[in-house]
């Protein structure tokens, strides 16, 4: 499923990569001003990221976080509230190694990971140390991730 999300002036198409035809259509038909966020388990992710950048799109990866209401992305272990901080950090690094040329991550919504300072802090530090952006889709207000970005 592809969701188009607008936050302020920025519009993003998220969850790209699960459906090849829809992903291709988004890259080819959406204007370059629209940022695209790809699922990290997308087959041949580096090729898709390059194609999107060639068409003028700013690219993000979706941050895989545990979602009790739905299945995890195949082959990608999500960041979890029950995992040790070092394990979540390793999972984040694995996701980061899936492609290059992206500018950051999109957190798909409120989760245990985004609500806990203890869980979010080492992840946020890793992203900040690498100069990567983080966009959180959070209709419920302020989260731990938000608080940590303003520290």
Predicted regions and their residues:
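Catalytic-site microenvironment of enzymes
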Residues: 1-151
């Amino acid at each position: 499923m592809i969701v188009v999300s607008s936050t302020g002036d920025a519009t993003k198409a998220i969850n790209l990569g699960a459906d090849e035809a829809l992903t291709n259509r988004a890259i080819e038909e959406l204007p370059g001003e629209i940022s695209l966020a790809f699922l990290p388990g997308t087959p041949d992710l580096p090729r898709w990221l390059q194609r999107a950048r060639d068409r003028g799109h700013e690219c993000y990866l979706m941050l895989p976080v545990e979602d009790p209401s739905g299945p995890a992305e195949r082959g990608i272990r999500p960041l979890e509230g029950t995992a040790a901080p070092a394990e979540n950090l390793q999972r984040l690094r694995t996701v980061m190694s899936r492609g290059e040329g992206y500018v950051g991550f999109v957190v798909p919504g409120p989760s245990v990971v985004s609500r806990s300072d203890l869980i979010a802090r080492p992840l946020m530090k890793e992203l900040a140390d690498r100069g990567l952006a983080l966009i959180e889709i959070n209709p419920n207000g302020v989260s731990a991730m938000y608080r940590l970005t303003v520290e």
